[in-house]
């Protein structure tokens, strides 16, 4: 296991680059949310005794390995190191973390601006929809269970959940929402929910959940979804929700606003 690897491993100096987060900002870390892949990579390498830090071009000859993660394809970043690993949809939509790294609890301490009382992660991966603007179905495939909410929480009470379509997970989603309610987690599904999937069974639970900023997010990407969003919001209100709704929209494109 990891403990055996640590004992025989030649300790390395690891550099991390959050291309989206560092490219346009002076501060260290993500613009808004931490990069989950880099947080897991940091946890893995620290676990086997490596030194992990943000890549500093002034010391570029001192790195044994540099990981570059890019979600979007807008930025380019040039580095020098003995070994460079590039990952994320900005480089290759099919890139994935090795299983032994993906199973690690992320180390958010690499980010100076991430709240220590908040955890970030996914309950599911994938999505059954095939929206023309989205790479998730091509990258991750059909919806499937990923991590239990208690594993994501890892002792924290605030959770930012980045699932692309949690409600499409059916009974698994119901079970996870029930656990969120029982545990008293305060959550945010920051990639939004699919209003078309909101049934009475879901609405009852969504109304009971403690939401960060008392806000539920929905995707209203096209004009045809306006009616479904209104239906879902009215249904959740009918079960006693008194917070606010946040709708994502797309400007331009097929059926866009």
Task: Please name every model-derived segment.
Residues 1-86, 91-93:
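A short, structured N-terminal alpha-helical element that caps or precedes a catalytic domain
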Residues 5, 12-13, 21-23, 76, ...:
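N-terminal [4Fe-4S]-dependent radical SAM core
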Residues 8-11, 58-64, 78-81, 114-115, ...:
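Flexible, charged surface loops at secondary-structure boundaries
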Residues 16-19, 67-71, 135-232, 243-253:
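Core AdoMet radical
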Residues 29-52, 130-134, 185-193, 216-223:
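Acidic/glycine-enriched edge-of-secondary-structure segments
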Residues 45, 180, 236-240:
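Hydrophobic positions in alpha-helices of CheY-like receiver
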Residues 80-82, 135, 233-240:
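Surface-exposed amphipathic alpha-helices with a cationic face
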Residues 255-257:
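Catalytic cores of alpha/beta
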């Amino acid at each position: 296991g990891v403990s055996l690897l640590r004992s025989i491993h030649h300790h390395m100096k690891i550099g991390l680059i959050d291309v989206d987060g560092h490219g346009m900002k002076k501060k260290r870390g993500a613009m808004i949310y931490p990069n989950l892949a880099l947080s897991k990579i940091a946890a893995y390498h620290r676990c086997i005794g490596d030194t992990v830090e943000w890549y500093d071009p002034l010391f570029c000859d001192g790195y044994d390995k540099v990981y570059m993660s890019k979600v979007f394809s807008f930025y380019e970043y040039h580095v020098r190191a003995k070994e460079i690993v590039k990952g994320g949809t900005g480089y290759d939509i099919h890139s994935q973390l090795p299983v032994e790294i993906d199973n690690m609890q992320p180390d958010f301490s690499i980010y100076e601006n991430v709240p220590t009382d908040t955890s970030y992660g996914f309950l599911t991966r994938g999505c059954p929809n095939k929206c023309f603007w989205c790479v998730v179905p091509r990258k991750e495939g059909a919806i499937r269970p990923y991590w239990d909410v208690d594993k994501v929480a890892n002792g924290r009470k605030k959770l930012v959940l980045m699932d692309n379509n949690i409600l499409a997970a059916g009974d698994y989603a119901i079970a996870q929402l029930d656990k969120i309610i029982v545990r008293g987690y305060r959550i945010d599904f920051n990639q939004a929910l699919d209003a078309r999937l909101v049934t009475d069974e879901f609405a009852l639970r969504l109304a009971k959940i403690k939401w960060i900023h008392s806000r539920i997010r929905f995707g209203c990407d096209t004009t045809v979804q306006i009616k479904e969003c209104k239906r879902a919001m009215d249904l959740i209100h009918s079960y006693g929700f008194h917070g606010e709704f946040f709708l994502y929209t797309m400007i331009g494109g097929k059926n866009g606003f």
